[in-house]
Amino acid sequence: MARKPLLHYFNGRGRMESIRWLLAAAGEEFDEKFMETAEDLDKLRNDGSLMYQQVPMVEIDGMKLVQTRAILNYVANKHNLYGKDMKERALIDMYTEGVADLYELVLLLPLCPPEQKDAKVDFIKEKIRTRYFPAFEKVLKSHGQDYLVGNRLSKADILLVELLYNVEELDPSAIASFPLLKALKTRISSLPTVKKFLQPGSQRKPPMDEKNLEKAKKIFKIP
């Protein structure tokens, strides 16, 4: 029996959460080995497991993969979530890069100095309302299909829906004016594998709180 993928990261969302989402949606079970201290990260670096001295790192199918996008692309290819031809893959990449741009803003928000946080939140909300959500809504409207690309599930749908959940934690009303995004969120959330991942007790991680933020800062030696 093949080994399950083993995910090396800290016990929080960060840059691993999208990988958790994609594996879960694909129905591929995985194990996790959490770093608890800076020494745990140093050990991975010193034993040569991290090509660029960085995590996330996933042991999968005999490889030690790093770089979030490379890992996501491998999982998507493995589970037929990456389109049927070059044109579809180009669209999927274009949409997921847009998702990644907004995701990065949300991901780094906890590290924002307190005196700058309100302004940063307002900036993110403005980008959501005027740039990113209208763009994805327009794609869905343009073809009238259930999924972003090729009328079949792809990594673009899964990663966009993960982002929708994250944005709703920041602004519960953000999706209200985008009916097709709301419908996509409901559709993807109803898939048995995703529905299971959204249940309490799954490997999905909660929003970053102060305790986990301080722990992450110590592990990654962030001032």
Curated annotation (Swiss-Prot):
Q: Which residues carry this modification: N-acetylalanine?
A: 2
EC number(s) on record? 2.5.1.18
Q: Which GO terms describe its molecular function?
A: glutathione transferase activity
Q: Which residues form a coiled coil?
A: none
Where, per the database record, does this protein carry N-acetylmethionine?
1
Q: Which GO terms describe its biological process?
A: glutathione metabolic process; xenobiotic metabolic process
Q: Record's Gene Ontology CC terms?
A: cytosol; extracellular exosome
Q: Note one Pfam family from the annotation.
A: GST_N
> Which PROSITE patterns would you find in this protein's record?
GST_CTER (PS50405), GST_NTER (PS50404)
Q: Which InterPro entries match?
A: Glutathione-S-Trfase_C-like (IPR010987), Glutathione-S-Trfase_C_sf (IPR036282), Glutathione_S-Trfase_N (IPR004045), GST_alpha (IPR003080), GST_C (IPR004046), GST_superfamily (IPR050213), Thioredoxin-like_sf (IPR036249)
- Keywords for the protein's UniProt record, in alphabetical order: Acetylation, Cytoplasm, Transferase
N6-succinyllysine: residues bearing it: 4
What quaternary arrangement does the UniProt entry report? Answer: Homodimer or heterodimer of GSTA1 and GSTA2.
Q: What is this protein called?
A: Glutathione S-transferase alpha I
Say which species the protein is native to: Oryctolagus cuniculus
